[in-house]
Amino acid sequence: MNPRLQDSYDEFDRQRRVDEPAKSAVLPGTGTEHRTDFARDRARVLHCAALRRLADKTQVVGPREGDTPRTRLTHSLEVAQIGRGMAVGLGCDPDLVDLAGLAHDIGHPPYGHNGERALNEIAKAFGGFEGNAQNFRILTRLEPKVLDATGRSAGLNLTRAALDAVTKYPWQRGDRTKFGFYGDDMAAAWWVRDGAPAERPCLEAQVMDWADDVAYSVHDVEDGVVSGRIDLRVLADDDAAASLARLGAEAFPTLAPDDLLAAAERLSQMPVVSQVGKYDGTLGASVALKRMTSELVGRFANAAITETRSVAGGGALHRFVTELAVPTLVRAEVAVLKMLALQFIMSDHGHLGIQADQRTRIHEVALILWGQAPSSLDPLFAPEFVAAEDDGARLRVVIDQIASYTEGRLERVHEARSPRPLD
């Protein structure tokens, strides 16, 4: 039997690509490792620099907007918490799903999806840019932790099951816009996916993906309400609900407009939603809003657990034993909330103007770094640029450096190296 299809995590799942030497700083008599392999994986992600940098990377609005900003880091913490709770209910290893939540956006560049778009434009002729593929590249190559026998970086050297848990799209680019591996990372990808069903994410990755959808939909709407951009009472307006349903049907072709209209109606009639009313920042309004976010997260997470259990039965569910099942009505409700954020935050005219400026800044920084490389590159990246065999590989190094930047650093590099206008 293929070891990846067995009913428990085994040595195959816990294997690391590179053998690691015993720790040398251990006090005599204290050398026993009390953590599981997956707990160690989680700790490696939690302590890595790439995760910390997410504190200055945009979720929906900028990390320096407002007094209680959500950043890519806080979003990742929320995804990890939601996913961990779901893992307990399903029988997945909680540390695996937790670390997948922590790492699921670790490859995001400055300005979130907008920065991703800009870097994809720059790298279009050389394999493109995709945040999920960058996740894998960071974890298996770019984040310094372990060296292989040739002295090359093996990234964090996570276990096979951990890397698979972070992989939402287990395929190369091809003609698809969403993908999980760049061409020059395929040796690591083949190792991770050895024996796995073709193009099927493991259950832990599916749980992480749904936890991401739940956190994204609920918490981004919460931020929109607090900022005054979203008024939840629009859900009860027929015209507004119809508009959200049209948007949702375009974004999620598997959902019918009638399902989305019904979802908007259900949401509007939920007491925890209607009680938020016109948010005014008072104690009562803040408590009502927090109650809504808490109950919706629980509703969406528990629905997936219950539906999956109804299909797969009891016992521990993990890896490729089953797939995550989510009721259509719940998928529709999450889609409606996503469309609220899209329509009232991300499609705002002022927001679109800011995004255009951000993309221009990334393009200009790429030109600056490319024109002055390798001296313009950090010590981690400059040797890779020098060793690269062609322009595509050299450009990938420049892309790696830009993707690693916080928004603050990107703006400092742009300001310092851009020509200043004459007074």
Swiss-Prot record:
GO molecular-function terms, A-Z: dGTPase activity
Q: Which domain of life is it from?
A: Bacteria
Matching SUPFAM superfamilies: HD-domain/PDEase-like
Q: Which Pfam families match?
A: HD (PF01966), HD_assoc (PF13286)
Q: Which family does it belong to?
A: Belongs to the dGTPase family. Type 2 subfamily.
Q: Which NCBIfam families match?
A: dGTP_triPase (TIGR01353), PRK03007.1 (NF002829)
The protein's name is Deoxyguanosinetriphosphate triphosphohydrolase-like protein
Q: Which organism is it from?
A: Mycobacterium sp. (strain KMS)
